[in-house]
Amino acid sequence: MSIHGTAVIHPSAFVEEGATIGEESYIGPFAVIGPEVVLGARVTVKSHAVITGWTELGDDCMVWPFATVGEVPQDLKYHGEHTRLIVGARCRIRGGATLNTGTEGGGGVTRVGDDVLIMTGAHVGHDAQIGNRVILVNNVAIAGHCVLGDDVIVGGLSGVHQWVR
């Protein structure tokens, strides 16, 4: 486990052996950080958020309560392969949002660019590629393998079918 000396971890948080926590990061009460997770500098993980899987969050990201970041893909073809979720810098992942890792058949990586806002209850499916400065409004569902370019705004309660670019 690599926890920078300036990181603050609440006593009730559960940070698994092997996790990497960057400088000046904060892990809140009852948050869970998995063993393969890498958090950049100044990342804030609020109460009850879960970050797991082979997941990387860039510098200055914030994750709100009850978000689930880096869980395995919702794909019946997934059988435990080493796949990843990479989130860029300065992203905001609001409460109840879900972001899945990739699948072997889809390239193995779900990617979220820099300066992205993922609002409450939104979902980013396996192997999705989300550009920079994207906003996913409340309860948006981005299915597997979707590609969103830079500066996209998806309105609330919208669904984007898998493989859409």
Language model segments and positions:
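Structural signal for interior beta-strand "rungs" in well-ordered beta-sheet cores
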Residues: S2-R165
